[in-house]
């Protein structure tokens, strides 16, 4: 090894070690000036010898060349969100759901940590070196932000030690400490630049800079909270012990993280953090509670978007008084008419709130609210503004009643309210401009067709100018037509056309979700695709066939049937296919034709000790069974584990065959 190469190795090792001591252990061992001197020496040597550059060099923290755009990253294991609890009752319900499913949870410890108000990221380490960082995105697909993340000094570019897996994905939160946020805004104020509203926005904006040199100037920090991919090695079977392993490898862990042994201790942890919230160095909006035993986590499994073994216990919403100046009625993509309160702007929970939903006519009546009232505004879970009560003693004499419209405020079609539903809807369908706009916005959204650059304002202009009326019209647009829109030059117009062409290659679940069928979310769209395997089969399905799909009940099935029964919807679908929208063909898993389960409609209920519900479902489907989420007269058999509830009772009432876990294992052999 040459003298220069040896010195570079020494400098990188020294700077890595001191970086961990300073940013992770909060125990600096050399003066800042000495650290800066070593960094300058490293930069000078690397500039003089670019052939000796290393991907894990501490010098990368100063940022690299600007990017044209962020690349997409598909998460090998989805980054799910968490369900929320807002009071002790909801926390207890969460605990009861787990113990009903797996009684052993009663004897498990819980790992508790503050819920940081930042941005979730994924860090991939290969042979100990940080090779990729990505945002959470929609949970399935995020953005590659590796260059930006390398500038965050508390994130190690190379792990310490040697006992880590060869591939290890670390997940955590990037945030901006309060002191750093205040200093950043003070500098912006001094320079006459725009200030950030809150630390979370500042962190998110900093991470999404195309120029990593800007990110490098922002005071960002990181705490790890879980792992994803683990290959070529093993981690502890305790969530808390995994934290200690990560810390040993140089990754920062929130110092408030605590292991507790009972629900009472969980509540005590919550109260302690709540009382100390303002004194913490970072913004939080609750605490996260996780079952500590990794095997129990695996047995509990997941629902569509969240794990069953973890929950976010949110802090009480922050409330303020303000005036209700007016109420506007907005029309959504399914025709739902929502009253929106126009408020005197008020700062609540870190943001200025000027609008709040009043939900529907029933909610207005329940609140007894009138225009001109002083109202209590709350950001539930520090996120969604809502009016929770009226200060009646402050009601002015000229307060006005809120009258729900009988005609659509946009297209003047009749407003209808189906018996048993709280929501009133415009009956205009696609002749209603508001519904067209919202349907198109949904169609191009990230979780649907994911058309980059086709934002809300562009959609509104396209509809207002009568350039599009259905989703298929979007794919008929030409770049030259788009340049008449505001802030749409030739390059931007071509980018939109390129994005539309790229979006033509999609998946059947995304296409179904993009159609905007009432109450058909991502999970239902995925179930439909996996059940029917083709669009043609879905288009021709009966109500009874829709009900056979896992987690599709009578209400959703009726919405599906009504949607595909309308000629105009079928016409739009055909036009989209004519424009070249395609997706990979789906095939059913190989089925053993002599299986006793082939073609049977099966329901799983209760908890199983020898395999997870997801594993049981997959094994049953591989043998040709159709696994559904509810018991009906069409169900052939029910497999009941421990603590089986209403599904078992209904199966018994209907005279359906019920088998225990051991019988399930025998069927699967």
Curated annotation (Swiss-Prot):
Sequence positions that bind NAD(+): 32-36, 81-82, 113, 136, 173, 290, 314
Lineage of source species: Bacteria, Pseudomonadati, Pseudomonadota, Gammaproteobacteria, Vibrionales
Species this protein is from: Vibrio cholerae serotype O1 (strain ATCC 39315 / El Tor Inaba N16961)
Cofactor(s) essential for the protein: Mg(2+); Mn(2+)
The EC number(s) this enzyme carries: 6.5.1.2
Known role: DNA ligase that catalyzes the formation of phosphodiester linkages between 5'-phosphoryl and 3'-hydroxyl groups in double-stranded DNA using NAD as a coenzyme and as the energy source for the reaction. It is essential for DNA replication and repair of damaged DNA.
Gene name tied to this protein: ligA
One MF annotation (Gene Ontology) recorded for this entry: DNA ligase (NAD+) activity
GO terms (BP aspect): DNA repair; DNA replication
Top EC group: ligase
Protein name, UniProt field: DNA ligase
PANTHER family: CHROMOSOME TRANSMISSION FIDELITY FACTOR 18 (PTHR23389), DNA LIGASE (PTHR23389:SF9)
Reaction catalyzed: NAD(+) + (deoxyribonucleotide)n-3'-hydroxyl + 5'-phospho-(deoxyribonucleotide)m = (deoxyribonucleotide)n+m + AMP + beta-nicotinamide D-nucleotide
Gene Ontology cellular component terms for the protein in this record: cytosol
Domain BRCT: 592-669
Entry-linked Pfam families: BRCT, DNA_ligase_aden, DNA_ligase_OB, DNA_ligase_ZBD, HHH_2, HHH_5, Nlig-Ia
Record's keyword terms, sorted: DNA damage, DNA repair, DNA replication, Ligase, Magnesium, Manganese, Metal-binding, NAD, Zinc
Binding residues annotated for Zn(2+), in chain numbering: 408, 411, 426, 432
Active site (UniProt): 115
Family label: Belongs to the NAD-dependent DNA ligase family. LigA subfamily.
Keyword DNA damage: yes
